[in-house]
């Protein structure tokens, strides 16, 4: 029941603000946006299955954000990271890589749903799957040749190739950003002290906590940023993450978290807050070029 246009605008606004803050305050190459897994929990579990309003769900996200701020100030989140064994920290980065790969294969329909085996190989001879394979080959060649911006070039080339394939659908170039007013500061405090609210907040807290920790450890490991088993300026990164979640709820979006696609920037050499800062600015630009960016097929980014 949420306004789609308002959701688009608020997602871009909060992602841009949080990512820029990560670059300026934490000085780390991590980008933030509403997490897809938590988005699914917000929409399907809380609203559709449990039957609560989206205003109720936003209230739960807001409370979760406040708790995260408290846990960050008291260094609880840092202590959790410290007690994770070194071998597990390294394996987390591997797991995140596999997770990203699976998302990409699924988006490109190379891996599809199967009732008997859960997943199976899709039709690789046409459509998004074939386009994705072409994109993988193009991007791989560029990466091997160490071409600057290899992944970006690969996405652009794959998008253009997708036009004759009928996969890329051009939607225009520029549009005026929709207003965020329909979902701004829309909370429901009537059931704040109910057992259901406690369960939902705890679930959001638990998933977001380990999602963020796993992403930070995995991407930082890939970037070679971990010194003596510790991530530099970790507390600042956690604080940005907590503030983003709280602010995101106020603006009308689900839990904002550091997302695994940050690995793409690291892979291209990003090691400082400048990476996050530029990414945040690109988020703002995309607000006005939404039709153009929405023309990029998932097979090209997969």
Question: Model-predicted segments: where are they?
Answer:
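Short, amphipathic, aromatic/basic-enriched membrane-interface segments that mark the entry/exit
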Residues: 1-7, 25-31, 118-128, 265-275, ...
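Helix-loop-helix hairpins and the membrane-proximal interhelical loops
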Residues: 1-6, 119-121, 152-235
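Helix-loop-helix junctions within the multi-pass membrane cores of secondary transporters/permeases
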Residues: 14-15, 24, 35-93, 219-302
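Structural motif marking the loop-to-transmembrane transition
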Residues: 5-9, 51-55, 59, 85, ...
